[in-house]
C-alpha cells in the first residue's frame, strides 16, 4: 500500500470510540425545601454515559441507539449534541416511547431502578438500522448487555459486535446486569456470556462476576473468563472497596475514596 493510501486509512478513522446501546431518561430524586421527594430528569444509560466521558476527555465519540419521537427523545438528542457526541447513529421511532427509569438511592450509596420499558424504543433497534460506517470509522467499539435483554436489539447488538470484530476493532464490553429487565436470569447469564466472545476489554462488577462464574474470588473469576473468552483486559468494580484490574497474569487492586452519590 502506498503512502497516500496509508494517509487515507488514518484519516478515515473519524472516531476514537463508537458506543451502542440504551439511551434512556433517568429520574433521580432530591429533597426540596418542603422535604418532599422531587425527581429530576437526567439523560442516561451506561453506553451513552461512556460516550459522554470520552467526549469530555477531548476524544471523538459517536453513539448508536434508538429513542422515541417524544419529548424525552428530543432531550436525548439535544444532550448528545451538547456533549459533542455524533448523533448520526441515533434512530427515532414513533412506534414506542423513550425508556424511563426512576432511581432510588439506598443508604449504602447503591441505586435501585424502576424501569418503564414495555417496550421502550431502545429495545427495538434492528440490525439494519445500525450505521455500520460508524463502526468502520472507529478505533474502539463499545457495547453493554442491557440492549440484549430483548429482540430485535439483542440481535442488533450481537451482530454489531461481530461486525466490529471482523473489522479488527478493539471491542469494549460492559456486562451490566439489571435483573428486572430480563425475562429470566438463565437467559441473562447465557446471553451475557455469549457476548464475551467478542470482547477485548471487559468492565464488570464483583456481583456480576459472581453471577456469571459462580466465583467470589477475583483472581479465579477474572482468570476463568479471560482464558475462556480470550479477553485481554478486565476491570472489576468493587463499590466502596475500589477496583481490581487484570491484564494477563498481572493484577492490581486500588482502594476507593469517598464521594457523594449523585
Provide a role label for each language-model segment.
Residues 2-3, 7-16, 162-163, 218-262:
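Conserved phosphate-binding/catalytic region of the ribokinase-like
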Residues 60-143:
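Conserved N-terminal subdomain of the carbohydrate kinase-like
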Residues 73-85, 189-197, 221-222, 226, ...:
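Short, electropositive alpha-helical surface patch
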Residues 146-224, 231-232, 241-243:
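Conserved beta-alpha-beta core of the PfkB/ribokinase-like small-molecule kinase fold
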